[in-house]
Regions:
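Active-site-proximal loop/turn and secondary-structure-junction residues that shape catalytic pockets
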Residues: 24-26, 58-60, 126, 148-151, ...
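Short low-complexity, flexible loop/linker segments enriched in glycine and/or proline
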Residues: 34-37, 67-70, 157-160, 225-231
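Structural recognition of the beta-strand scaffold that forms the well-ordered cores
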Residues: 18-22, 51-56, 118-122, 141-146, ...
């Protein structure tokens, strides 16, 4: 979250609305990205018209399916990368996974007063058809990103300098692509956002691009509209 204020200012300055997928991850300042320290930051983004969705509560990675015999409901081997169970492995039912997704969504709504979109992004984009079906059954459709939309802010700055990433994105991004960037990557020595985000937005706009949230994306719009009057099942209390 260390570059979150700068990213928010760049988005505001350039009149760009984004969809933030949030998990309660460790931060260099405060009590986690969905803790009280950052609550006002999230509230301000809601007031600006941004959208929100779940990235799971403890940034929990799917590792594999655990498939039983006939008639046995699928389970999932998972590993949280934040929170008190960081680094451990568990076998979860579909209901437990839904609760993990729903907990982040519920916290975002409690902080911002705005209902998050009925979407989620699995950490690392790691899923299986069974996991996607389980999440969809409790009201959440998965959102990945476009190949050209992987902006590279989590890659090594030695191998992938900012100038290279900017040039590649401006060359390859196509209409309808979903772009992926983070609110801070500790491991990258040369921070991406201060050097790339605004030139990327300006450059794409000069090519005739506009920016919208996932609420307006044709791949997800019908799903969101169908779910808007429903409360996703299995939310954590």
């Amino acid at each position: 979250m260390e570059v979150a204020p700068l990213m928010a200012e760049i988005l505001r300055k350039n009149q760009v609305k984004a969809t933030f997928f949030a998990a309660n991850e460790r931060t260099q300042t405060g009590d986690g990205s969905l803790g009280t320290h950052w609550a006002d930051w999230w509230k301000a983004r809601a007031a600006e018209g941004h959208e929100f969705a779940s990235h799971t509560w403890d940034h929990t990675y799917w590792r594999s399916d655990v498939v039983g015999g006939p008639g046995v409901a699928p389970q999932f081997r998972v590993s949280p990368s934040a929170g008190p169970s960081e680094g451990r492995e568990f076998i979860w039912t579909a209901q437990q996974y839904c609760e993990e997704v729903g907990r982040a969504s519920a916290r975002l709504q409690a902080i911002t007063g705005k209902k998050p979109l009925p979407l989620f992004r699995a950490p690392g984009g790691k899923t299986s058809p069974r996991l996607l079906a389980a999440a969809k059954a409790c009201g959440y459709q998965h959102v990945g990103w476009s190949p050209a939309g992987f902006l590279g802010d989590e890659l090594s700055s030695d191998r992938y300098p900012n100038a290279f990433l900017l040039k590649k994105a401006l060359r390859d991004i196509q209409p309808g692509d979903i772009l992926l960037a983070h609110l801070g990557i500790w491991s990258r020595k040369d921070p991406w956002s201060p050097a790339v985000l605004e030139p990327l937005i300006v450059g794409l706009k000069s090519r005739g691009f506009c920016f919208q949230t996932l609420r307006e994306h044709p791949q997800y719009k019908a799903w969101i509209e169908a779910q808007v009057s429903r409360t996703p099942a299995k939310l954590a209390k």
